[in-house]
């Protein structure tokens, strides 16, 4: 964002974005009486606020008027709002209300998709001006947002140069206007004039103005203003439209050369000013190399009867590869409660933002929210094929009953009314006006929205009811001056996330209401409405379709998380938790301070561990350095550490060092822990139980099917692993890989190794396998090492040609020692195929193929996995190691068995 912020500020005491633009003269006749400068200043404030709200999820413009009686807005304001949305349907995005001396404009969020008038595609952003110009025959035309959007989309699709097997780089198409030959009768007459070293005063140029030619005459009295106004429009217009010639000092009607008298202009100063004006023009590239705008500037003598009379200026502008602006676009957004202008680069990035174009997304995932139909700040959301769609998740979690008001989750509601006398009566009284919908309870809606929990809050409840706006209730144990601020902040965050994360495109607000459950009497309740504004009727949910659409956006808000693909794609993409994962994630941490989570291979245990640590920070108001994540191997430790949500260590480091400041511990891949360095479980319990305010969190994630050794794990007996939850929905692997996992899991269940507790594998019959994801499973036997390496290199080459990158590939061997053994042969084969370098799993974000051991890659994943000679010292755990190997592959798995077995 630009540092120079607009002096408009968001008012903090509302559960919505409310921008106060100060006093504005309203009424058509009143506005006509204003001086033009005041009328324009008032209009600019209102338009900036409207633009910022359209681009930031919607909200309210609040302005003061001089009279209390109702008055119309004014035609100039109405017309400017219509121009802003480029539609005559003003009510689609703006509605007005008046209360006393306050005039409110309710602004719905902008969203992509077709214009209703002509079905053309809306731009991603609203802008007061694009600052993009183009030639239109003899005129310079400013592009509106719709034209700018189409122009930028076209510029973003140049020829593509492939450099290497996986880097696709846009190659700019650079052109220059051709130089003409005076002897050629077909030569361009404008270029012939441009090549001259002088012009004659009064000379009539032999060509008219056209798309390629513009004539301008200037007065030296206003030279600075002329350069400031003319150059930033005409030079970008030529650059954006095939190039052209700007002749300054030629009358545009008569084509007569007039120049400027030598007494009134310094040619060197003129050159400097024009060059400075051109070099200041913002240029945005979609290509490499990023070359500057190219032009030729000539200051030539104008002769009168053979004597120097003055000077003329000629500028030849070459076509530009991408986009040249006159200045930064006039577009606004709300950031950190300030109204800020967008930089040119940010504006172009948001205008041209599209869903990721990745082969893997189309093969593995289904789109739940697309940028092509979402609000400006939304991100694309994908779910794994075979998993619940957002509509199915909404029906599972937040279904709207046919003719009554439902309280959910029922188990939480029962707990709350058993813990707090009078709560049921208080809630039922509040719900009397509503006959259909859903009331969603939470111990803390703030925590659900990634905000900090507030002490003294019994619960929050979100009402989604027919013929009502959404209402967030906060129920306090006793009166609290900060209770209303908490409720307002939570409602504000919920409303913003429903639009900007959940992609809701309807008119929406969330009213905030605070209730106090008096300890003296269960029937007494003190309440305070936080939002004094009366929203238009269109903000109420009219029926089932509207309620379900809003609840589907709520599903994305609550179940969405940053996809691990985001780092690979270079843009933020969201995935959704499964209903089973969300059920565990939504459990009260205060009531489940210790929990064992048994998850089958590919059920999302590590994702859950990361989500739980984020929740711990908000529930217990603790810093990241007070949460410890412990795993067995260093690559997974590094991967989690890079997220900056906790302190991450390996088991060995955990047992070796003291952790005086740690309050909460999350342990992952615990089935592969050992006791060789000490009692890790005992140490973890002692650390989390030493706090004076009560025990901290100790959650342990494990999967006995992936036990890769025969030593003692240090886990307590299965009967003591309580409370315990199970993740049985397999979400990672393609169908052929999932079937292979099923087969190997059945082998383990039939004949488990001696260190796997009896009964812990009985979760297998409950396994749910997501289907519908195509993939590959190849088991290639009886190959020499050289043949294996050639096969790996050839297969990688084919995948890279299809759009995959080295970040998608892992080559896994049995032990760390074998890595060096195979590395030389693999590199030799890769170099023959002109592929890439290798690295171990400690650098998962690097642009390279991972070569490491199966054990060190535990907890990580790649789309394409090669398993070379998987074997173990004891055959009893070979099926476990094969599961560890296979479950790392999301889509394509190639196994080269040792000795053909």
From Swiss-Prot:
Transmembrane segments: none annotated. Zn(2+) binds at residues 285, 287, 321-322. Changing residue 234 to A: No effect on endonuclease activity. Changing residue 669 to Q: Abolishes ATPase activity, leading to abolish ability to inhibit DNA replication without affecting subcellular location. It is found in: Nucleus; Chromosome. The keyword ATP-binding applies. ATP binds at residues 599-606. GO terms for molecular function: ATP binding; ATP hydrolysis activity; DNA binding; endonuclease activity; helicase activity; tRNA binding. Its cofactor is Mg(2+). Mg(2+) binds at residues 209, 214. GO terms for biological process: chromatin remodeling; defense response to virus; DNA damage response; immune system process; negative regulation of DNA replication; negative regulation of G1/S transition of mitotic cell cycle; replication fork arrest. Changing residue 252 to A: Slight increase in endonuclease activity. GO terms for cellular component: cytosol; nucleoplasm; nucleus; site of DNA damage. The active site is at residue 216. Pfam families: B3R, SLFN-g3_helicase, SLFN_AlbA_2, SLFN_GTPase-like. It comes from the Eukaryota. Exhibits a wider expression range in ovarian and colon adenocarcinoma than in their corresponding healthy tissues. SUPFAM superfamilies: P-loop containing nucleoside triphosphate hydrolases. Belongs to the Schlafen family. Subgroup III subfamily. Inhibitor of DNA replication that promotes cell death in response to DNA damage. Acts as a guardian of the genome by killing cells with defective replication. Persistently blocks stressed replication forks by opening chromatin across replication initiation sites at stressed replication forks, possibly leading to unwind DNA ahead of the MCM helicase and block fork progression, ultimately leading to cell death. Upon DNA damage, inhibits translation of ATR or ATM based on distinct codon usage without disrupting early DNA damage response signaling. The N-terminus contains an endonuclease domain. The C-terminus displays homology to superfamily I DNA/RNA helicases, although it is in an autoinhibited conformation. PANTHER family: SCHLAFEN, SCHLAFEN FAMILY MEMBER 11. Homodimer. Interacts with MCM3. Interacts with DHX9. Interacts with RPA1. This is Schlafen family member 11. It comes from Homo sapiens. The lineage of its organism: Eukaryota, Metazoa, Chordata, Craniata, Vertebrata. The gene is SLFN11.
